[in-house]
């Protein structure tokens, strides 16, 4: 029985992933590459950190020298200029400044920032200086989950913040978008019964993107996958709501495939369309 494999043009759109490496292959650069290629685009990378991790947790993190991160970004833009950029794990303020400097120098567009602060396992992956207002200000959209949005909003408001309802999520998205000057997608996947996300712009426009929650304990790399898929949509010229909606549909398929690997929170099936 033959399998219909989607085709792509000889000169596909490309997406640059600036993120950390995950030795288990489920998140970070590895998840980004799988997502971008599965969606028919060409993946390029700049590695910001090496992590020793598996489905049960993170054992060690080693940040890449900022000069090396900058050199990787320069090398990419000197040849195959990306149509979109996804920024994931930024381990330090120095790396954040290097990324901002080089993306600004190259006039990067369609930047999607996934503010990776804490791994699915609970391990802290970035210091406070890595949350860069300058980087967020360059972004087309920033994609925090609820815990990350609570941290970001707490820093803006200088007090502890909790998101416990859709009204709270909408308020957070609007406040963060206004403060940082870019769109914010607050992801509701941590909810018990649904995966409703809210997208807000600095101008105060709000769009809810609703979906049912997939009952699957294997969620390692969901944030990386969604943000990379959004970048793919933007690279292909979709408007923001359409790019997010398509990305959510792809992620839904990754979860519904129910790949079952590892002894902890396992990885997604990024290739569900092909098998």
Residue ranges and their predicted role:
Residues 2-11, 28, 193-209:
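Acidic-glycine-rich active-site phosphate/pyrophosphate-binding loop
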Residues 2-17, 31-120, 125:
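Conserved N-terminal subdomain of the carbohydrate kinase-like
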Residues 18-24, 206-221:
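Short pre-catalytic strand/loop immediately N-terminal to key active-site residues, enriched for Gly-Thr
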Residues 30, 35, 150-151, 216-240:
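Short, small-residue alpha-helix embedded
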Residues 39-44, 206-207, 233-247:
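Phosphate-handling active-site elements
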Residues 68, 94-109, 132, 182, ...:
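Nucleotide and nucleotide-moiety/phosphate-recognizing core
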Residues 126-206:
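Conserved phosphate/ATP/ADP-binding segment of small-molecule kinases
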Residues 241-275:
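Charged C-terminal helix
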């Amino acid at each position: 029985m033959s399998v219909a494999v989607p085709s792509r043009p000889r000169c596909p759109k490309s997406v640059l992933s600036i993120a950390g490496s995950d030795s288990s292959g489920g998140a970070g650069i590895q998840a980004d590459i799988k997502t971008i290629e599965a969606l028919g685009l060409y993946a390029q990378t700049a590695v910001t950190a090496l992590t020793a991790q598996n489905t049960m947790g993170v054992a060690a993190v080693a940040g890449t020298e900022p000069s090396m991160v900058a050199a990787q970004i320069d090398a990419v833009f000197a040849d195959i200029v990306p149509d979109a950029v996804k920024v994931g794990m930024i381990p330090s303020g120095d790396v954040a400044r290097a990324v901002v400097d080089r993306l600004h120098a190259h006039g990067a567009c369609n930047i999607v920032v996934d503010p990776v602060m804490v791994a699915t396992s609970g391990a802290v992956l970035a210091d406070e200086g890595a949350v860069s207002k300058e980087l967020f200000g360059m972004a087309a959209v920033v994609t925090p989950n609820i815990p990350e949005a609570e941290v970001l909003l707490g820093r803006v408001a200088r007090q502890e913040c909790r998101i416990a309802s859709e009204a709270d999520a909408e308020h957070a998205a609007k406040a963060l978008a206004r403060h940082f000057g870019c769109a914010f997608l607050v992801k509701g996947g941590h909810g018990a019964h649904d995966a409703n996300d809210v997208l807000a712009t600095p101008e105060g426009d709000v769009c809810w993107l609703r979906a049912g929650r997939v009952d699957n304990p294997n969620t390692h790399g969901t944030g990386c996958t969604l943000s990379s898929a959004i970048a793919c949509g933007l690279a292909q010229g979709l408007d923001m709501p359409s790019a997010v909606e398509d990305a959510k549909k792809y992620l839904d398929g990754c979860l519904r495939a129910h790949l079952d690997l590892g002894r902890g929170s396992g990885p997604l099936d990024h290739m569900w369309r092909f098998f």
